[in-house]
Structures are given as C-alpha cells and as structure tokens.
Amino acid sequence: MKRNVKLGWLMTLLMTAALTVPARGQVLNSAASTITLNAVLSQSVSVTLSANAVNFTLTSGSANNPGSTSITATTTWTLKPSVGSLQVYAFFSNSASALTDGAGNNIASADFQISNNGGAFNALTNTVPFGGANAGLQLSSTPILGNNRTGTRNDVMNFNINLVPLPNLPAGTYTGTLTIQAQAI
C-alpha cells in the first residue's frame, strides 16, 4: 500500500507539474515617447501650353487671318480654403505693338483676337493684372468652392489677326509674344 501511495503522490506531482504554467515575471513598460508629424501641401497654380508657336499667313486689309493651330492652356491648381476664384488671362506687354516688324510697323493688341473654347473672337483690349494697359483678355474665371480646391481646366484658344484697321500695313515678318497666366484670388 505504501508503494501505491507513493505512486499516487508521484502521479499527482507529475500531473500538477505538467498542468502548471510557468510563472512569468512582472510586466514593466517604458514611458511613452512621441513623434511629431508635419505634412505640408503647398498652394500651387500652374499653366502648361500644348504648343508655343502659332503662324499666320496675312492678307492685307482682311478681317480673317487665322492662326495655323489652336493651343490648349491647361491650368492646374491646389488652393487654400480662403481662395475664392481662379482666373486665366492672355496678354501682351504693350497694346500698341503686340506684333512688330522691328522697323516701326506694328499690329496692336486690339487687332489680335482669341476665341476661347469655341466662343466668339475677342480682341485683347482690356487691362488685366498682368502685361500692358489695354493689352489683355480674361479667358476664364472659375469659382473655387469646397469641392474644387484642387482641379484642372482646359482653355482651347484659336487665334485671328484682323487687318481691317491696318489697310496700309507694309509687307514684312511680324513677331510678338503672347503670354498666358493664371491668378488665384
């Protein structure tokens, strides 16, 4: 019987040892350390053009002297909530000599016309935020609301030179620089 008791105790001891989970040490945590994160999305407005040259074959005294190609101005923006609108402008630096032959003969901005997105042709006769006085045209105005703080728009421009006001314009090569620029206000 003693032997059975010893065997019983031994079995109990073995079962207890097998079922006992080893004790873990006390959990010790460090102090929390933080990381400050800063992410900046800057405001931006950009204009890209599908081409940068237009040629004209002029007919003396003619109202219809179309440009060789249309140009698309793609305006892209990312703006703050305080911005209310985005305008796109076309302008020359001087209204009296939008195009010149370099010998004193000029084509004024009032004789240069743009049709924007299939609309009527308009001369560049307005004073806009850029360029010379009476040498510009507002192509578009986009209200900036909560749903378009980031966006893109296209302005497809066709060009014409009206030579009716210049019946005595001498033959020559006339060059000029038209600038397209956007403004967010």
Model-identified regions with their sequence ranges:
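N-terminal signal peptide c-region/cleavage motif recognized by signal peptidases
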Residues: 20-22
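N-terminal small/polar-rich segments of proteins
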Residues: 24-120, 126, 136-185
